[in-house]
Structures are given as structure tokens and as C-alpha cells.
Amino acid sequence: MSRLATRFGQLKSQQRKALVSYVMAGDPHPQVTVPLLHQMVEAGVDVIELGLPFSDPMADGPVIALAAERALAGGTNTLDALNMVKEFRQKDQETPVVLMGYLNPVEVIGYEKFVSTAHACGVDGILLVDLPPEEAAELDVVLKQFDMDQIFLLAPTSTDERIKHVVKQASGFIYYVSLKGVTGAATLDVAEAANRIAKIKAETDIPVGVGFGISDATSAKAMGGVADAVIVGSAFVKPFATL
């Protein structure tokens, strides 16, 4: 059983929801990332979402876009991020780590090399924001060879047919984007998100996590009432800039 499946199973038996925290690899400088990951786990984070720095993060708002800029300026690249996971695994073999990023750096490295290296370093899954399921078959074949999960996005605009299509291909968990916009944007509509999540959960047993717009304890608690995981990005990343 994968680390993600094990963790979600443990939380379900404890009647708890997962706290998934995003951190940009190498932000604000490379030496901070691994100690920060351990501190996050000690503080109660259940799943780590490690951002891969990219120069054109089209789905990210200003907070995470600036984090990517700082990481790139500090010299962190995709392979460096994988090595950070490898170092993290020297002390933590249990906390799931999911990579979140964009397709271009992965294609540059090559699917086989990227996935095999990520697996060897202790990565559990990947979410590429700009890779839709219709174009993900080649990567999926390689991920399955290494028992790694491929996570996909669903949004408020996703049709019922789209939901059915995506849940058939996803593994690990479904990432529901609760807002129409970039990360860290706007105000969360809890009622709409709850309705959409219910539709997704009616189609699959895969856990559903909610991200985008989770900015405080109130919104996290509200989403934890309807989803299996609460994903916090910008609200955590913003103070990291001062480390």
C-alpha cells in the first residue's frame, strides 16, 4: 500500500481530515527546505506538497509565483527538489510527499529519468497543473511502473462528464480547485464547494482534497467538513519568505 493510501486510511480510522501543506522547494533558499518539511510534520501536517520551481507558473497567484522566483534565483532546479525529498526521507519514511509543478521541466528531464529518480528519492505522487488527463497516458504508464500516484485537478467549472472521466484516471487523491482563478485568490464559496465535492465523491472512493482559497482556520474547518483533505498553499508560503 502506498504512503498516501496508508495515511488517508489512518486518518479515516481516526475520523480526521488530512492537512496538506504546500511549500516551494528552495524558497527562500535551499538550506531552509528540508528542516522546514520536518517542522511542518511536527506541527501536524499530514501530507507534504512540494512545489517545483518554474519560471512561468500560470496557475499560481503572486505569493507562490514570487516563491518560485526566489527559489530559482537561489539556484534550485527540479533535480535539486528531488534531492531535498531524498534528504527528508533520511529521517521520515512515513509522511507522503507529492510534487506539484508544471510539465515543461519534467519533459526536459524525460519521463523515465524523472519518475525513476523521484521514486528513488522517496516521492509518492505528482500533480502537473498543465497536464490534463487526456494527455497524461504516457506519463501514467511510467508512474505505474514505479507505483507512484498521478493526481489531477477538478474545478467549479468541471462538468459531470468531466468529473467521471478524471476520477477514472486519478490516483492518490483528487485535487478540487475551489476557486475560479489562481492560487491565493478571492473568497471561498463554501456552499458551492461542498456541492461540487459531493458530486465528485459520488463517483469515486479516492479521497478528495480542497485547495485554492483556504486562507484561515474558518475556511479550513468548513472544507474539512465536506472533503477528505484541506490543502493550504499561499497562507503558509507567504511567511516563509522571511525565513
Language-model region placement:
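N-terminal small/glycine-rich loop or linker at the start of catalytic domains
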Residues: 6-28, 61-67, 88-100
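Glycine-enriched alpha-helix->loop->beta-strand junction motifs that scaffold or abut catalytic
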Residues: 44, 118-124, 142-150, 168-176, ...
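Active-site-adjacent beta->alpha loops and helix N-cap segments on the catalytic face
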Residues: 1-11, 30, 55-66, 73-86, ...
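Hydrophobic faces of well-ordered beta-strands that scaffold small-molecule active sites
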Residues: 19-23, 48-50, 97-101, 126-128, ...
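Conserved, mostly hydrophobic/aromatic
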Residues: 21, 40, 51, 118, ...
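Catalytic cores of alpha/beta
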Residues: 30-41, 158-168, 210, 214-230
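A C-terminal functional module that forms or caps the active site or interfaces directly
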Residues: 191-231, 235-239
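Glycine-rich phosphate-binding active-site loops on the catalytic face of alpha/beta enzymes
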Residues: 45-55, 123-127, 132-135, 176-184, ...
